[in-house]
């Protein structure tokens, strides 16, 4: 019966494609059309094909020829489609007497449809025709060929034969089964007693096996309890490790933030320190340049002084001559009056008039010379103003160049800071990636341990079930042995049929028990193997956990090292702050020390100028009115603030120059003289006044020297000194140095007053506490840089 049921299942796949109008024979060399229908059970594909196979094919490769199945147009899934293929005649087989059939093959190589067999035969003479009545009792005659009729009969007989053969085979199978059952039951009857003995022996063995299984079960329970406890411990360890990793990560993030802040502060402090150093160097250079320019200007002013002194001496000489001539004229007028009173001689009057005319011509010539000299003096002043303006423009250009240089330095610093920031970002990214990797590994280990724990629980349940089943089987086996004895006693009086039925009932429990024992033993073996595998995996996981703990310890050590590095950088930053504070203090002290000599010089200038004017005014008998304002410095103090700085960046404005005080005119010719001099104090610094010059100012000589006598007689309000020279003065010890003294040696002398640390070369001001300085030096030896208590 099974063969009849399997046939439609096997042929069901071949009905997905149905071939229509298949003839029994075709001509060998003629074109052949193949009509087929695609059912909803198949989905067409462009790589599907239809082949001509010999009957008896085994695989899809046994085709004779094939054509690709075209994809139907406007195809809708779940619908039936009719298709046509045309095979060319020269691809078809010859008349060989073999049977062929069409087969539809998918792109996967599956055959989903097959046609009825057919042959390729050449045309033959007209066969004999036969007439036969219709089977439907319709009183109609059907004309067929003899061969067709014979084929129909053969097909019917073949079908009947196949059905009969199938029935015979089924009956033979049934008889064979019945005979086998009879023989088996007879054999079972003969061997039943022997089996009872064997079962009793097996029962004893099973009792021993159950005891051993109980012992093994207890051992497995102990192992399971140990494994569960270890799993709990491992889970707790994993939780603690994860908490520690999270804490370390938070600490690492906070340390990174602190490190970034410290680096940022350090960079800011370094930038400030560099800018202050650059400003200090610029100020030094500016001071050197100003000193050089001052020396040049002093030399130029000295030359101008000499020129002015010569011109003024000539002017005073001419003024004295004019005064003498006026006195002579007055005397002559008096004489003329007296002479006119005494004598009225015309000749004398003509002579006197002619002398008067000559004297007036001389006076006019002297006036013209005075005007010419005044013009020359004004030209010299204009040239000096132009040189000052050129100097101012040069200084402005120099400042522009300095600003450009500062901008370039700032850009370089910014680029360096960006590079450092990129390096720190990459390092932080790598550390974060490593921490994430550690987290993933810990999570995977925790999941693996959970799975192992669940498997252990499952195995424990299976062991409990097996122990319960073994106990139940023992009880059932004892009951069945008693029933077996009763059945054996009753089977003697029964017929063979009933005995056969009882035999069928009795041996089934024993076979089931034996099978169950075998299954239980196999399960126990499998469980032991699984437990061994689990223990191995557990040991491996334990080893992995130890490795992860070691890695965590390594990362903790690295974090500790990072903390130490960060602390060292913080110490360095604090040292930099201290150095910067000390540099600022030193800068302020230098500023004060440089301002104090400037104030002293200004006080000396203010104290000297009134004395000079006083001496000149006392000699003439009248008091001069002087302004109390301080003189405007030509280049200003570079270390002073912008508001209190004298002068505007070295610019020299002629309109702001303090003019000399106006004297009471001694005669009318002085109003026409054009003379402008700056109100700068060209006297020497404190303590450098020449004693001979002061004596000459106090003691007026009695010799009738016309130029000098006229200068001291009228007083111009200037204290010119041709022997003036600039000296260098130490701002700390006030030691004087000649003007041509080397600048580097002068700076070395000034720096020698400072206290220098022999370890770090850090400078301290001269008034710095000696104990604090010694404590700073000792900090380099006890490895505590920040110990300034």
Curated annotation (Swiss-Prot):
Residues 481-508, 639-660, 678-712 are annotated as: Disordered. The modification Phosphoserine is found at residues 124, 138, 225, 593, 609, 666. A zinc finger (UBZ1-type) spans 727-753, 754-780. Changing residue 777 to S: Reduced affinity for ubiquitin. Keywords: Apoptosis, Autophagy, Coiled coil, Cytoplasm, Cytoplasmic vesicle, Host-virus interaction, Immunity, Innate immunity, Metal-binding, Mitochondrion, Phosphoprotein, Repeat, Zinc, Zinc-finger. Residues 320-420 are annotated as: Oligomerization. Gene3D superfamilies: 2.60.40.2840, 6.20.250.40. It holds the Pfam family CALCOCO1. Zn(2+) 2 binds at residues 757, 760, 776, 780. It is found in: Cytoplasm; Mitochondrion; Preautophagosomal structure; Cytoplasmic vesicle, Autophagosome. Changing residue 114 to Q: Complete loss of TBK1 and RB1CC1 binding. Changing residue 774 to A: Reduced affinity for ubiquitin. Residues 144-599 form a coiled coil. Expressed in all tissues tested. One of its GO terms (biological process) is negative regulation of apoptotic process. GO terms for cellular component: autophagosome; cytoplasm; cytoplasmic vesicle; cytosol; extracellular exosome; mitochondrion; phagophore assembly site. Residues 481-502 have a biased composition (Polar residues). Its main location: cytoplasm. Zn(2+) 1 binds at residues 730, 733, 749, 753. CDD domains: Zn-C2H2_TAX1BP1_rpt1, Zn-C2H2_TAX1BP1_rpt2. Ubiquitin-binding adapter that participates in inflammatory, antiviral and innate immune processes as well as selective autophagy regulation. Plays a key role in the negative regulation of NF-kappa-B and IRF3 signalings by acting as an adapter for the ubiquitin-editing enzyme A20/TNFAIP3 to bind and inactivate its substrates. Disrupts the interactions between the E3 ubiquitin ligase TRAF3 and TBK1/IKBKE to attenuate 'Lys63'-linked polyubiquitination of TBK1 and thereby IFN-beta production. The C-terminal UBZ-type zinc fingers function as ubiquitin-binding domains. This is Tax1-binding protein 1. It comes from Homo sapiens. The gene is TAX1BP1.
């Amino acid at each position: 019966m099974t063969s009849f049921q399997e046939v439609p299942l096997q042929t069901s796949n071949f009905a997905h494609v149905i071939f229509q109008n298949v003839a029994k024979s075709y001509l060998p060399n003629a074109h052949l059309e193949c009509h087929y229908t695609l059912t909803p059970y198949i989905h067409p594909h462009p790589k599907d094909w239809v082949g001509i196979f010999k009957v008896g094919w085994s695989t899809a490769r046994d085709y004779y020829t094939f054509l690709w199945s075209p994809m139907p147009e406007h195809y809708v899934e779940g619908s039936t489609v009719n298709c046509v293929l045309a095979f060319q005649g020269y691809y078809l087989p010859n008349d060989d007497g073999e049977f062929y059939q069409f087969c539809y093959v998918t792109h996967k190589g599956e055959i989903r449809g097959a046609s009825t067999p057919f042959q390729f035969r050449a045309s033959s003479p007209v066969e004999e025709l036969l007439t036969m009545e219709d089977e439907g009792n319709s009183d109609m005659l059907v004309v067929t060929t003899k061969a067709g009729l014979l084929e129909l009969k053969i097909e019917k007989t073949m079908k009947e034969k196949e059905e009969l053969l199938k029935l015979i085979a089924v009956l033979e199978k049934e008889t064979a089964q019945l005979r086998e059952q009879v023989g088996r039951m007879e054999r079972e009857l003969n061997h039943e007693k022997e089996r009872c003995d064997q079962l009793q022996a097996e029962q004893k063995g099973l009792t021993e096996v159950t005891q051993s299984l109980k012992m093994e079960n207890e051992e497995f329970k102990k192992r399971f309890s140990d494994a569960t406890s270890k799993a709990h411990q491992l889970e707790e360890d994993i939780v603690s490790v994860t908490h520690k990793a999270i804490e370390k990560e938070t600490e690492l993030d906070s340390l990174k933030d602190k490190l970034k802040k410290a680096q940022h502060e350090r960079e800011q402090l370094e930038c400030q320190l560099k800018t202050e150093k650059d400003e200090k160097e610029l100020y030094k250079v500016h001071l050197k340049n100003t000193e050089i320019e001052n020396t040049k200007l002093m030399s130029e002013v000295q030359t101008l002084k000499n020129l002015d002194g010569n011109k003024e001496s000539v002017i005073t000489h001419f003024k004295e001559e004019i005064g003498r001539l006026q006195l002579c004229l007055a005397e002559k007028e008096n004489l003329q009056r007296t002479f006119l009173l005494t004598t009225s001689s015309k000749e004398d009057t003509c002579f006197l008039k002619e002398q008067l005319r000559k004297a007036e011509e001389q006076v006019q010539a002297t006036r013209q010379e005075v005007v010419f000299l005044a013009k020359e003096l004004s030209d010299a002043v204009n040239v000096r103003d132009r040189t000052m303006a050129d100097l101012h423009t040069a200084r402005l250009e120099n400042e522009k160049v300095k600003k450009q240089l500062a901008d370039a330095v700032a850009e370089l610093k910014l680029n360096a800071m960006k590079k450092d920031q990129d390096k720190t970002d990459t390092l932080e990214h790598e550390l974060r990636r490593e921490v994430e990797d550690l987290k993933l590994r810990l999570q995977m280990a925790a999941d693996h341990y959970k799975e192992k724990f669940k498997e252990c629980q499952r195995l424990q349940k299976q062991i409990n079930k097996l122990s319960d089943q073994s106990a139940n089987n023992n009880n059932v086996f004892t009951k069945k042995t008693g029933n077996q004895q009763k059945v054996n006693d009753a089977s003697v009086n029964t017929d063979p049929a009933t005995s056969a039925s009882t035999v069928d009932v009795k041996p089934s429990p024993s076979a089931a028990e034996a099978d169950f024992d075998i299954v239980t033993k196999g399960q126990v073996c499998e469980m032991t193997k699984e437990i061994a595998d689990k223990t191995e995996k557990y040991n491996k996981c334990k080893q992995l956990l130890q490795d992860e703990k070691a890695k965590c310890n390594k990362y903790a050590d690295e974090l500790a090292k990072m903390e130490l590095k960060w602390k060292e950088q913080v110490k360095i930053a604090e040292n930099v702050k201290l150095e910067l504070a000390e540099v600022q203090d030193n800068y302020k002290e230098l500023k004060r020390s440089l301002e104090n000599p400037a104030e002293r010089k200004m006080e000396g200038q203010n104290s000297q100028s009134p004395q000079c004017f006083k001496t000149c005014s006392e000699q003439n008998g009248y008091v001069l009115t002087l302004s109390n304002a301080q003189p405007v410095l030509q280049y200003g103090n570079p270390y002073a603030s912008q508001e209190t700085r004298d002068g505007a960046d070295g610019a020299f404005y002629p309109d702001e120059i303090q003019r000399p005080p106006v004297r009471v005119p001694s005669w009318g010719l002085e109003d026409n003289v054009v003379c402008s001099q700056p109100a700068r104090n060209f006297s020497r610094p404190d303590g450098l006044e020449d004693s001979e010059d002061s004596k000459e100012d106090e003691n007026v000589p009695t010799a009738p020297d016309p130029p000098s006598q006229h200068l001291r007689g009228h007083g111009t309000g200037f204290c010119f000194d041709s022997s003036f020279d600039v000296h260098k003065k130490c701002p700390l010890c006030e030691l004087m140095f000649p003007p041509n003294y080397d600048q580097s040696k002068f700076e070395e002398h000034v720096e020698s007053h400072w206290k220098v640390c022999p370890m770090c070369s850090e400078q301290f001001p001269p008034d710095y506490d000696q104990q604090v300085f010694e404590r700073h030096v000792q900090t380099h030896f006890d490895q505590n840089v920040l110990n300034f208590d």
